[in-house]
């Protein structure tokens, strides 16, 4: 498959200009002991901060250099992988689990994508570098952050700025790289002891990349986001904040029949927090949010309609879908010596609608049609016994009432529209979740834990409304697909010493009524069916970092996931293969240098024709290994320049979790996985004031 693209540009003036600007501002910076500093030079892998919890700074440079969305950031945490669409907007997978099994929150709000095939998954609307912290909880080991998080929870968080005197804080970065990669991020906060104004913005763009064979892979993108927050802090324990944000993007997808011509985001939120309340009552928190995703897919903005494709794709066409989600949460914390209690309520309401048109931009004149409405309310509590001691029991319980209404009056098919047999029907379900975990500190720096968790998940929009068919005997997926129930055991060991840090975690679970997609045929004529099966999952992750003499560090991580379909006695689809990362880093007072080897084995445990709403197993995949180098220079504790080369030897390879390339771009009719980028150069400057 051959394509042409415009030559790569240098784009080198941007980091130089930013570097000169921020260097000039150093003359007016705060004293060194008050400065906000940059710590790690380049992140190649993340380690847990506590049992099953990962916390990392998304603004630090990462290798391989991530795309503009959140999926590539998550891949530095062992156990995460992603399904590639093109150059950006990959769909995250944790331990082989996909979709709403992974609860993704931005500033404690839920922004759900609108595309029936998840071309705009939730991470498509999140700009990671505009957040202060990325927190990950693996497994069903928390009930605080919503229902159904059987695989885990991902939170992109912003801190509350506090000022002792009037001042200004800033975070800025610029990135340039191969295929005209060009990113800028600016986050400014102006405040005093009684309040603040915070404004953040980012833009990101890149052209189509070339794989290791030199072939162009359709993958270009352009993105921007902007957010502003105004906070009132009358004292050190009180916060009232209102915020608003917007964004948009375009993205070319090698593995889709259409591209993303619009990713419009509109967000509003408010939050209140009061700490150090009298007596045992310590904290009260509340937040409300409104998020809307307005997404346009077409086959003419970023490509030319393919005259050889099946109807109706030879002619220009577009689909406009919209998802509005609004919700809120109230929680309180109580402390009694070594006992901590958290209790609260939360809920959300979501509406999905769409319109489409044949011909360029004719969809704009079409009327909106609502097809689904979701609603959920829940109560939760978490209890910690032995908080602050060397033996801790942590438990949680959650109960949710979920409902969904089918608003479709008719269902589109290859032979035209037909009446919907479930029009106006509503499904209601009670969902229960809970966990119990024991943690013990055995010696200095050594901790082990074991936890048992259970999660019940309501089928999401993509599982109820996207499939062409439901289980055998059901009129459609809306009536036939049942809630998914996961029971999982997590165990692990962590050690943090002066020179050695090591950790290992393992899990085994049983999933009743796992929601499985089966595909019959391919292309526009292909049909999908959603059904429930019983499944088993298991796996492990491990990491090691050793500090040697001479400021050297050696590290490595390992991740493995396994799944089995008990009903059909075959592998569970979309399971990533065994992956290892080995790193060597040298870090001096100002300079650092590092190397990263990533090795992935073949995957022969496949279930061809089965998967999820986005992807299916395309057959066995080959193993591969890539090598990357990085270097960084710290001008001061606040200013840093880093650079690197990914896929140094220009290897041609593809990931197991993948889409088949679209025939519109010259990919063969037989499914062929999309190759990863070839050799890529990048340079990034970070400034923090």
Predicted regions and their residues:
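C-terminal beta-signal and adjacent terminal beta-strands/loops
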Residues: 510-512, 599-608, 632-689
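Acidic, small-polar-rich N-terminal luminal/periplasmic segments of exported/outer-membrane proteins
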Residues: 34-165, 180, 491, 672
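Outer-membrane beta-barrel signature, preferentially recognizing the C-terminal barrel domain
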Residues: 170, 257-282, 320-325, 372-374, ...
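Transmembrane beta-strands of outer-membrane beta-barrel pores
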Residues: 158, 174-178, 192-194, 203-207, ...
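Signature of Gram-negative outer-membrane beta-barrel scaffolds
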Residues: 213, 341-446, 458, 469-471
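Flexible loop and strand-edge segments within Gram-negative outer membrane beta-barrel domains
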Residues: 206, 212-213, 219, 237-284, ...
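Periplasmic-side early beta-strands and strand-to-turn transitions of outer-membrane beta-barrels
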Residues: 116, 142, 155-157, 163-165, ...
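Gram-negative outer-membrane beta-barrel transporters
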Residues: 3, 385-393, 401-402, 501-502, ...
């Amino acid at each position: 498959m051959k394509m042409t693209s415009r030559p790569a540009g240098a784009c080198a003036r941007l980091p130089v200009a930013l570097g000169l600007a921020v260097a000039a501002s150093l003359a007016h910076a705060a004293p060194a002991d008050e400065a906000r500093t940059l710590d790690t030079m380049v992140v190649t892998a993340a380690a847990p901060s506590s049992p099953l919890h990962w916390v990392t700074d998304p603004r630090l440079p990462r290798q391989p250099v991530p795309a503009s969305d959140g999926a590539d950031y998550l891949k530095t945490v062992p156990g995460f992988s992603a399904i590639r669409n093109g150059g950006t907007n990959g769909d995250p997978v944790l331990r082989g689990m996909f979709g709403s099994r992974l609860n993704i929150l931005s500033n404690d709000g839920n922004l759900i994508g609108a595309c029936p095939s998840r071309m705009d998954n939730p991470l498509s609307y999140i700009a990671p570098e505009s957040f202060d912290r990325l927190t990950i909880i693996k497994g069903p080991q928390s009930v605080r952050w919503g229902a159904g998080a059987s695989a885990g929870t991902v939170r992109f968080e912003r801190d509350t700025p506090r000022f002792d005197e009037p001042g200004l804080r800033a975070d800025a970065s610029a990135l340039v790289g191969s295929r005209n990669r060009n990113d800028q991020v600016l986050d400014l906060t102006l405040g005093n002891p009684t309040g603040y104004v915070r404004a953040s913005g980012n833009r990101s763009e890149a052209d189509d990349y070339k794989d290791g064979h030199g072939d162009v892979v359709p993958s270009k993108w352009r993105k921007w986001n902007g957010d502003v927050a105004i906070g009132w802090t009358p004292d050190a324990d009180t916060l009232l904040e209102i915020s608003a944000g917007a964004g948009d993007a375009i993205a070319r997808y090698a593995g889709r029949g259409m591209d993303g011509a619009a990713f419009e985001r509109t967000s509003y939120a408010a939050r209140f927090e009061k700490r150090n309340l009298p007596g045992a009552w310590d904290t009260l928190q509340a937040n409300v949010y409104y998020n809307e995703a307005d997404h346009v897919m077409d086959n003419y903005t970023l490509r030319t309609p393919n005259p050889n494709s099946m109807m109706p794709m030879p002619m220009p066409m577009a689909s406009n879908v919209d998802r509005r989600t609004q919700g809120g949460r109230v929680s309180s914390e109580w402390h009694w010596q070594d006992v901590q209690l958290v209790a609260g309520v939360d809920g959300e309401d979501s509406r999905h609608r769409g319109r489409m048109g044949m011909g360029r931009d004719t969809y704009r004149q079409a009327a909106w049609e609502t097809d689904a409405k979701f609603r959920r309310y829940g109560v939760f509590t978490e209890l910690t016994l032995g908080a602050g001691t060397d033996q801790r029991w942590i438990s949680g319980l959650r109960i949710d009432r979920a409902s969904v209404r089918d608003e479709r009056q008719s269902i589109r098919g290859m032979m035209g529209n037909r009446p919907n047999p479930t029009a106006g029907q509503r499904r209601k379900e009670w969902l229960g979740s809970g966990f119990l975990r024991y943690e013990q500190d055995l010696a200095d720096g050594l901790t082990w834990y074991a936890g048992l968790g259970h999660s019940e998940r309501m089928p999401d929009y993509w599982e109820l409304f996207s499939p062409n068919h439901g289980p055998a005997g059901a009129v459609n997926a809306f009536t036939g697909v049942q809630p998914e129930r996961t029971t999982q055991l997590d165990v692990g060991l962590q050690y943090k010493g002066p020179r050695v840090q090591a950790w290992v975690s393992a899990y085994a679970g049983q999933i009743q009524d796992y929601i499985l997609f089966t595909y019959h045929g391919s292309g526009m004529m292909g049909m999908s069916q959603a059904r429930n099966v019983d499944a088993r999952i298991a796996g492990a992750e491990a990491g090691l970092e050793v500090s040697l003499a001479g400021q050297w560090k050696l590290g490595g991580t390992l991740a493995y996931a396994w799944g089995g379909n008990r009903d059909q006695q075959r592998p569970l689809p979309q399971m990533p293969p065994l992956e290892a990362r080995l790193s060597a880093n040298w870090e001096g007072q100002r300079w650092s240098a590092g190397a990263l080897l990533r090795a992935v084995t073949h995957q022969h445990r496949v279930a061809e024709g089965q998967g999820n709403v986005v992807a299916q197993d395309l057959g066995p995949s080959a193993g591969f290994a890539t090598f990357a180098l990085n270097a960084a220079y710290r001008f001061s504790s606040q200013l840093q320049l880093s650079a690197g080369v990914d896929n140094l030897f220009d290897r041609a390879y593809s990931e197991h979790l993948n889409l088949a390339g679209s025939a519109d771009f010259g990919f063969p009719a037989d499914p062929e996985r999309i190759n990863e980028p070839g050799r890529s150069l990048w340079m990034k400057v970070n400034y923090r004031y």
